[in-house]
């Protein structure tokens, strides 16, 4: 096991995989860049029916403090994510550091631990439970950018193929 701190890229990939493993089957990490109205570039964001979840990766206290000055943090209604979390190694972000409404995830030995604010499965879609009213236009712009790239590469037509279901081999039905 490495004694080196987890990098920002590693945190973003872990966050994306964590979202996918927790019901957000459409998820992106920070290598995906898209235009959004207020310049927000998610470290990880996931979408499921009725909810979106943003995860911000923090590798240092200075990064945490700088993040607070961004326009979509000063005015949370400009930001993406019905639910918002910070992910870090223990000791970088603590519960008392969180802006109102945010939750906390820690990475320990390469695994994501739910520290604070992760809701039960049914709470994700209950409007009254959501801590934020996400900027749905920014989220739509983000998703449009992803779908447009798939279209430019000739893959968008595959959405009409339906869901792939496991079939026994040799069955042509």
Task: Mark where each language-model region is.
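Catalytic cores of nucleic-acid endonucleases
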Residues: 52, 58-107
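Glycine-rich phosphate-binding "P-loop"
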Residues: 1-4, 56-58
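Non-catalytic C-terminal interaction segments of nucleic acid-processing enzymes
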Residues: 2-23, 96-173
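Active-site beta-strand-loop-beta-strand hairpin of nuclease catalytic cores
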Residues: 40-54
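A short acidic/basic microdomain associated with nuclease active sites
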Residues: 20-37
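Short solvent-exposed loop/turn micro-motifs enriched in small/polar/acidic residues
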Residues: 37-39, 97
């Amino acid at each position: 096991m490495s004694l080196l701190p987890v990098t920002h890229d590693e945190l973003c990939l872990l966050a994306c995989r964590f979202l996918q493993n927790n019901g957000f089957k459409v998820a992106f990490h920070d290598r995906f860049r898209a235009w959004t109205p207020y310049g927000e570039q998610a470290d990880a964001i996931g979408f499921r029916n009725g909810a979106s979840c943003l995860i911000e990766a923090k590798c240092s206290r200075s990064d945490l403090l700088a993040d607070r000055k961004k326009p979509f943090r000063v005015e949370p209604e400009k930001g993406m994510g019905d639910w918002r979390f910070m992910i870090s190694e223990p000791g970088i972000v603590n519960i008392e550091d969180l802006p109102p409404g945010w939750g906390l995830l820690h990475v320990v030995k390469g695994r994501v631990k739910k520290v604070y604010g992760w809701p039960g499965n049914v709470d994700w879609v209950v409007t009254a439970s959501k801590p934020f009213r996400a900027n749905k236009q920014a989220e739509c712009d983000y998703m449009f950018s992803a779908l447009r790239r798939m279209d430019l590469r000739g893959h968008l037509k595959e959405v009409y193929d339906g869901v792939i279901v496991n079939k026994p081999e040799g069955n042509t039905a």
